[in-house]
């Protein structure tokens, strides 16, 4: 296996990060971490933007939020999802995730099945083939606001990923006045 550059402080960063989460999320993250690390001895625990597990590419990661923990499979759209538990974001063709709000929702055997499949896919080098269509539909009200503020040209000059993230962020607003 090729030498992979990873954060040598990953374990300590993960410990610290988990300790700062809400108590319910700490329990869930610790359980997921234990399951993930038991899945394959070659799986590398890493820290990117949070806990990340690597074997011939990123396999999975997790993180706690105010009311849930999101467990992400980075090439999740390749998984068969026999239990129909994976959620998707229509703006992300790769990832699939599971939301947990209570540790009792975690079925170790099911998580391991999904992990084994994801690890096997990475070992085989399977990848999502993205279409070349990099179109973002920017809501009309956002375009109007950008024109009024004279920043539309700047927005259009941003990289696709930045524009996509910005539109997702705006569309995720729970109230119209915060849009």
What are the functions of these language-model segments?
Residues 1-179:
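Charge-dense, helix-prone N-terminal extensions
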